[in-house]
Amino acid sequence: MSTNPRFDPNFTPYVINSMGPKTPERARVILGSLIRHIHDFAREVELTPAEWMLGVEFINSIGKISTPIRNECHRICDVIGLESLVDEIANRIVTEQGLSPTSNVILGPFWSPNAPFRELGDSIIQDPNPNGKVTFMHGVLRDMETGAPIAGAVLDIWQASANGQYDFQDPNQSENNLRGKFRSNEKGEFYWYCYHPTPYSLPTDGPAGVLLNLMDRSPMRPAHIHLMITHPDYATVINQIYPSDDPHLDIDSVFAVKDDLVVDFKPKTDDPKAELDLEYNVKMALKKHHPNPNSAPPVSSFERYNKAGKEKL
């Protein structure tokens, strides 16, 4: 707390202590810390009434533009790095031997629980785009400690098309285009056809765009493929896979790039169905190593898609 003698040192504790005895303990911890930090923030920058009201109006604008499938507050949390930080806190795994699994990153708003199961070797490309570069993606799931292959894991993949839009953003794409679920085989192997990913901009027509512009930051996301891997015995892996030559890796608008998720796409000459090859191997941690072993991924905007219809996120 600020020690500036101009400010009443008893005010913040008074506000925090106003919480009644029926306040749940975890709520008391979170709200007490929030009040303490936001009061300290106001003192530190000597927030003016006009600046405070500008902030209130900005928060109001977040609610006004949000819809059942456009979660602008989620996007604001992304562009200030809060979701990435919460994800890191929730999923940090390091064993006593210093081993760690493949990195987790944010789920993002475009995951769908409705992606269909497909057979290994199938393509998730349902609506071909003339600019899409078909990629044969393959790899092996292994236990991070023993190196043993992990059979029977579900790999859920989704990506934007070559125009930078996901299926439910684009009326020209059918539902579940560039989405699919696969099961690893007895050798822990997985393989399918997808596209080399395409970079795209976050929507800038709302408060997130205003905030990015105010901070003189790019709205671009580097090209990426989303992957979520689940298994009854292992901690869930949610990540995004980035081409190493993408120019936006260092300026990702949601701070989700991690070194072990940056990969090389290579030319493929032995398969008439693909022009690129991507090998991507994954290390998974048993649930006993996970700080939140039974945590589920957050609800995505897409879960309300079928009721709300197609609308720009």
Swiss-Prot record:
EC number: 1.13.11.3
Biological processes per GO annotation: catabolic process; catechol-containing compound metabolic process
Reaction(s) catalysed (UniProt annotation): 3,4-dihydroxybenzoate + O2 = 3-carboxy-cis,cis-muconate + 2 H(+)
Cofactors, names only: Fe(3+)
Enzyme class: oxidoreductase
Alphabetized InterPro entries for the sequence: Catechol_dOase_N (IPR007535), Intradiol_dOase_C (IPR000627), Intradiol_dOase_core (IPR015889), Intradiol_RC_Dioxygenase (IPR050770)
UniProt cofactor note: Binds 1 Fe(3+) ion per subunit.
Compositional bias per record (Basic and acidic residues), positions renumbered to this chain: 304-313
Keywords: Aromatic hydrocarbons catabolism, Dioxygenase, Iron, Metal-binding, Oxidoreductase
Region (Disordered): 287-313
Residue positions binding Fe cation: Y166, Y200, H224, H226
Matches recorded under Pfam families: Dioxygenase_C, Dioxygenase_N
GO molecular function list: catechol 1,2-dioxygenase activity; dioxygenase activity; ferric iron binding
Induction of the gene: Expression is up-regulated in the presence of benzoate.
Annotated family: Belongs to the intradiol ring-cleavage dioxygenase family.
Function according to Swiss-Prot or TrEMBL: Intradiol ring-cleavage dioxygenase; part of the benzoic acid degradation pathway also known as the protocatechuic acid pathway. Benzoic acid debradation begins with the conversion of benzoic acid into 4-hydroxybenzoic acid through hydroxylation by the benzoate-4-monooxygenase bphA, and its partner NADPH-cytochrome P450 reductase cprA which act as a mediator in electron donation from NADPH. 4-Hydroxybenzoic acid is then converted into 3,4-dihydroxybenzoic acid (also called protocatechuic acid) by the p-hydroxybenzoate-m-hydroxylase phhA.
Subunit structure as annotated in this protein's UniProt entry: Homodimer.
Protein name, per record: Intradiol ring-cleavage dioxygenase prcA
Organism of origin: Emericella nidulans (strain FGSC A4 / ATCC 38163 / CBS 112.46 / NRRL 194 / M139)
